[in-house]
Amino acid sequence: SSNMVMLGAVSPFLSIPFEAFEESIRKIFGRKGEEEVDKNLQALEAGRVFAEKNR
């Protein structure tokens, strides 16, 4: 989860659409179940929100 927070935090500074990160997480963690996907998406979003608020 901490890696997802960090990935989310750098995402505003990369030339990659945020949706691409979300899509990749769904593909990578999808077979582990929806709970795992949701947990990682929430961590990704938390990192993004933090970075955008603290630029």
What are these regions (language model features)?
Residues 1-4, 11-55:
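Aromatic-enriched
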